[in-house]
Regions:
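Class I SAM-dependent transferase core
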Residues: 1-38
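General small-molecule cofactor/ligand-binding pocket signal
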Residues: 15, 92-94, 185-188
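Conserved SAM/SAH cofactor-binding pocket of Class I
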Residues: 32-126, 149
Length: 242
C-alpha cells in the first residue's frame, strides 16, 4: 500500500491508499446532501464506506455512525483513521457484505443510511473481482437492488436514505426505491460545467412516506477547468474540507 494521511479542516485525519480508490467529490456532495437533513440525535449507517470518509464528515452531526465495507484493506484503513482520531465511541467500522446486512445488524435500527455505490453495471464479469477500483466503480460485488434492499432493512419507519448515482439510471433507481417502500422525496442533479449534461444525481428517499418529490437547484461543479464554483467551495467549507 502507498499510504498518505490527509488532515481535514475539522482537524480529523483520514488515511488513504494512493494506489487504491481515494475519496472524491462524490462523497463530499453526498455527505453535504445528507448533512442538511439529518439531526444531532440520529444514528446512521454508511453502506460501502470505503476508507470511511462519509462517517468522518458526518460524525459531529450525529450520535453514532457505522461504516460497512466488504474490502478488507479499505476497512482496515477506515478503522485506523477512526482510531487515529479517537472516534471509537462515535464511529464503528464493520467488515462485511451489503448482501448480508440481516446477519450483521438489527432490523429497522437506523435513522438514516447513506451510500455512494458502484455506478456502472458490470459487463458480464469482465471486471477483476480482486481489483479495488473495479469494485468501487462497477457492480462486481453488489448491485443497485442489493443496496436499496439493505437500506430498507436497516431503516426505522420514516427513516431517510441518501444516495449519489448516475442520472442515466434514474428510472431504475426510482422503480427499485418504490419496490422497497422508499419514496423519493428530494433530488439534486450535478453537472461538471454550466453547459454540461448532468453526470451525477443526489437522492433522498424516506421509508413509508407519501409521494411528493422536491427538485433542488442543480449543482454546477466547475466555473472553469480546475476552478470550483462558489457553491461547491461553500460545500467544501461547510464540510470542513477546504
Amino acid at each position: 500500500m502507498n499510504l498518505q494521511t490527509d488532515t481535514l479542516l475539522s482537524g480529523y485525519k483520514i488515511i488513504q491508499d494512493k494506489d487504491a480508490f481515494m475519496f472524491g467529490i462524490d462523497a463530499v456532495l453526498l455527505s453535504n446532501f445528507a448533512f442538511s437533513s439529518i439531526k444531532l440525535r440520529d444514528s446512521g449507517l454508511d453502506l460501502g464506506t470505503g476508507n470511511g470518509i462519509i462517517p468522518l464528515l458526518l460524525v459531529d452531526k450525529v450520535v453514532h455512525i457505522t461504516g460497512l465495507e466488504i474490502q478488507e484493506k479499505s476497512a482496515e484503513l477506515a478503522q485506523k483513521s477512526l482510531e487515529l482520531n479517537n472516534l471509537e465511541e462515535k464511529i464503528q467500522i464493520v467488515k462485511g457484505d451489503i448482501k448480508n446486512v440481516q446477519t450483521l445488524f438489527a432490523k429497522h435500527a437506523y435513522d438514516f443510511v447513506t451510500s455512494n455505490p458502484p455506478y456502472m453495471i458490470s459487463e458480464h464479469g469482465k471486471e477483476n473481482p480482486a481489483d479495488e477500483k473495479a469494485i468501487a466503480r462497477h457492480e462486481v460485488l453488489c448491485k443497485l437492488e442489493d443496496v436499496i434492499s439493505a437500506a430498507e432493512y436497516l431503516l426505522k419507519p420514516h427513516g431517510k436514505f441518501f444516495m449519489i448515482h448516475r442520472p442515466f439510471r434514474l428510472a431504475e433507481i426510482f422503480n427499485c426505491l418504490q419496490k422497497y417502500k422508499l419514496e423519493p422525496k428530494r433530488m439534486c442533479l450535478v453537472s461538471p460545467f454550466a453547459a454540461s449534461e448532468p453526470n451525477l444525481v443526489l437522492i433522498e428517499a424516506r421509508k413509508n412516506a407519501q409521494s411528493r418529490l422536491k427538485i433542488e437547484p442543480e449543482i454546477i461543479v466547475y466555473e472553469k477547468p480546475g476552478v470550483y464554483t462558489e457553491r461547491v467551495k461553500a460545500i467544501y467549507k461547510e464540510m470542513a474540507l477546504k
